[in-house]
Swiss-Prot record:
Residues reported in the UniProt entry to bind [4Fe-4S] cluster: 95
Protein task: Component of the dark-operative protochlorophyllide reductase (DPOR) that uses Mg-ATP and reduced ferredoxin to reduce ring D of protochlorophyllide (Pchlide) to form chlorophyllide a (Chlide). This reaction is light-independent. The L component serves as a unique electron donor to the NB-component of the complex, and binds Mg-ATP.
Residues at which Mg(2+) binds: 14
Record protein name field: Light-independent protochlorophyllide reductase iron-sulfur ATP-binding protein
Organism this protein belongs to: Huperzia lucidula (Shining clubmoss)
Taxonomic lineage: Eukaryota, Viridiplantae, Streptophyta, Embryophyta, Tracheophyta
Length: 292
């Protein structure tokens, strides 16, 4: 199974991806996480340091792809999760998306796609185009990470559009498995968006300080819980997500709305709270009538 995880930059994709990878490994799966970001920090919390990237290795090999072996680019991490980092050109130079596309192709050529139960692509931000869209060419499922904010849902809407387009043009099925809410004490905007653009909500993680600290420490929650047992409840969020993924959900081909419609939808939610409350009361009344 291949998973592509997308979401707004800075939303906590990499921290979430690493913990989901460990959760899948705890369920007995052999997992490879591929970091698709020029910052090459996707797998940081699996080791506590930045591993050599595909670009680093190619430079050493003088860009002779035929001289690259799996052990040159695949590195062991905590919990038995293997890791690859694409890397990218220096800031302000080259194309990070091209490097991501080449990383995906190289991983396939090295037979990495066939050696693991789960391949998890952790992909840069919401730029689902060019090389950054290449993981969707191979993924069985896309998972979107978002919070209860406008920018994250704008990114969610654009990612949904990309998934729909890829699902339309691909011969291999691609589905949106659902949305994971991260750092989300409230979920009113998420619920409002999902009401208009239906998609499964796999999990909602509240704002938990230990998750932020885990990123700084370079550890997953599963490693931290070994010395801090009270964090078991946080691990359960990720294990629940992993269990839903492993159940091979039907998933959906999502729909999206225009940017202007999204602006109106979310801003009206706060600008017209009375109207929203009246609508909710009408819906509750209708539900009561149906039950009677």
């Amino acid at each position: 199974m291949k998973l592509a995880i997308y979401g707004k930059g800075g939303i906590g994709k990499s921290t979430t991806s690493c913990n989901i990878s460990i959760a899948l490994a705890r369920r007995g799966k052999r997992v490879l996480q591929i970091g698709c970001d020029p910052k090459h920090d996707s797998t940081f919390t699996l080791t506590g340091f930045l591993i050599p990237t595909i670009i680093d290795t190619l430079q050493i090999k003088d860009y002779h792809y035929e001289d690259v072996w799996p052990e040159d680019v695949i590195h062991k991490g905590y919990g038995g999760v293997d890791r690859v980092e694409a890397g990218g050109p220096p800031a302000g130079a080259g194309c990070g998306g091209y490097v991501v596309g080449e990383t995906v192709k190289l991983s396939k050529e090295l037979n990495a796609f066939y050696e693991y139960d789960i391949i998890l692509f952790d992909v840069l931000g919401d730029a689902v185009r060019g090389g950054f869209a290449s993981p969707l060419n191979y993924a069985d499922y896309c998972i979107i990470i978002a919070d209860n904010g406008f920018d994250a849902l704008l990114a969610t809407n654009r990612i949904a559009a990309s998934v729909r387009e890829k699902a339309r043009t691909r011969t291999h099925p691609l589905r949106l498995a659902g949305l994971v809410g991260n750092r989300t004490s409230e979920r009113d905007l998420i619920d409002k968006y999902v009401e208009v653009c239906p998609m499964p909500i796999l999990e909602i993680l509240p704002l938990i300080e230990d998750i932020r600290v885990s990123r700084i420490k370079g550890k997953t929650l599963f490693e931290m819980v070994e010395s801090q047992p009270y964090l078991n409840y946080v691990c359960d969020f990720y294990l629940n997500t992993a269990d839903q993924i492993l159940s091979k959900p039907e998933g959906i081909i999502p729909k999206e709305i225009s940017d202007r419609e999204l602006f109106s939808l979310l801003s009206d939610f706060y600008l017209n709270p009375v109207g929203n409350e009246e609508q909710e009361n009408k819906e509750n009344l209708l539900d009561s009538v149906v039950l009677i």
